[in-house]
Amino acid sequence: MKQGLILKSVLSAAIIASLAGCATAPAQQWEADKTYKLTILHTNDHHGRFWQNQYGEYGMAARKTLIDQLRADIEAQGGSVLLLSGGDINTGVPESDLQDAEPDFKGMSKIGYDAMALGNHEFDNPLEVLFKQKEWANFPMLSANIYDKATGKRLFEPYHIFDKQGIKIAVIGLTTEDTAKIGNPEYIGGIDFRDPKEEAKKVIAELKKKEKPDLIIAVTHMGHYQNGEHGVNAPGDVALARYLPAGELDMIVGGHSQEPVCMEGPNLVKKNFKPGDECKPDIQNGTYIVQAYEWGKYVGRADYEFRNGELNMVSYNLIPVNLKKKVEVNGETQRVFATSEIKEDSAMLEFLRPFQEKGQEQLSIKIAHSNGKLEGDRNVVRFEQTNLGRMIAMAHMQRAKADFAVMNSGGVRDSIQAGDITYKDVLKVQPFGNIVSYVDMNGQEVLDYLNVVATKPVDSGAYAQFAGISMTVADGKVSNVVIGGKQLRLDATYRFTVPSFNAAGGDGYPKITDHPGYVNTGFVDAEVLKDYLEANSPIDVNRFAPAGEIVYR
């Protein structure tokens, strides 16, 4: 970590703050008894998806067309627009990751984002990369609760003031304090991620004294948890709204938990939201809370009316960006647009295409070398423990700082041959873009889980590969479970990883996404394996060879 870069950012934030402090807040600019229209558009958890996926869904070119059209329509009716992002622009697909998300940040600038919250994945790279990204963005990256440990000063602009037809809007940025424990220690050792609730309280007091805004919006990367039940995660948006005096924040535009925040009733999230469904935002302690799922799949739209200092939401919806659904046509399954197709912006496509092509080229660059075959052939990996299955599990275990790891063999799609290894080889093994997730459970829960997962039959994708654990599997249950060299204790707490697909119940695994100890790390499996291969090259395949840890009888 380079202190010069930190100091540069601290000085920049300090200058901004001092200038704000010197200025006298202007008198009220809006007209009494006049109704103003204000629309907040928002996305979150972009995770490198600047290009459409293989089915032609989402992507920044289609998003630009949609947002340009919305902005034009709203302004033609006399309204104003503010476009916000809940953060996590980084980490998701190799074409973006290999280029430090340059197409993503520059693409956001072209779309016209007004501000974003810093997400935890903005700290997956060295700070030099983040400050470079800050220069690519022509909009402020906000976070009031990130401090430099050495100076005690904020690293980033805590808030930004916008004027929309005389309505003074303060937008505060907040970042989950969990970044301190899920981020890379090498890059964040000198950074203090403070309690965002406390920092919000401080900043709001400062704003009321110095700026006297008409509206205060928090753009956050903290997560939305039903009824504030955040489990092992740091408190999220619901806790923030409840912590502050009623109505202190007019709105929270969130991210991090990567879900559509659509409510069925008070403190009850709507399950299985689909494109085109009605979406009612959460309301907590007088504050609207919204989130637009992930990857630019939706653009959230909140329409407000502002009159005599009062803000009222008129409507809210999540607009799908070329999402598709499966239908049966003449006995064959096809994907069709769930709603009307959005044409991709040609200028944005022209801008992004060189980045996509460059990213594809970089996939052929050598990342590691192996002295033997890493076994992932379907007729082997679905029948027995293999060195590749174990390596993938070990990579997940290391990234999540877990005690052991579970990896479904159906997620291992190919072998890696001896010799040079490229990223393309990795993507052949793990092409699905599953996310590494983990859960903290007590020993009894772990035993119950293993009794289901470890007993899955061979010759199926559900057959599990393991790392960090040994056991005997017989008569439909497990015994002699040893984790970290010690016998399983029913009253102890253990952390294990599992692909997001299986965490959601895929392959008939127990669904654990609702478990209070569950965490979706946001790290894509192929990226995690790539990093592990690079760090451990040259690869000695014998190191990963199973040694009878899992005994089937």
Swiss-Prot record:
Reactions this protein catalyses: a ribonucleoside 5'-phosphate + H2O = a ribonucleoside + phosphate
Annotated site residue numbers, Transition state stabilizer: H121, D124
Lipid group attachment sites (S-diacylglycerol cysteine): C22
Residues annotated as binding a divalent metal cation 1: D45, H47, D88, Q258
Leader peptide range in chain numbering: 1-21
GO molecular function ontology, one term from the record: 5'-nucleotidase activity
EC number: 3.1.3.5
Binding residues annotated for substrate, in chain numbering: F432, F501, N502, A503, A504, G505, G506, D507
Cofactor: binding details: Chloride.
GO biological process: nucleotide catabolic process
GO annotations of cellular component type: cell outer membrane; outer membrane-bounded periplasmic space
One Pfam family in the UniProt entry: 5_nucleotid_C
Residues that, per the record, bind a divalent metal cation 2: D88, N120, H221, H256
Record's keyword terms, sorted: Cell outer membrane, Hydrolase, Lipoprotein, Magnesium, Membrane, Metal-binding, Nucleotide-binding, Palmitate, Signal
Function: Degradation of extracellular 5'-nucleotides for nutritional needs.
Annotated PANTHER family: 5'-NUCLEOTIDASE-RELATED, PROTEIN USHA
Name recorded for this polypeptide: 5'-nucleotidase
Record gene name: nutA
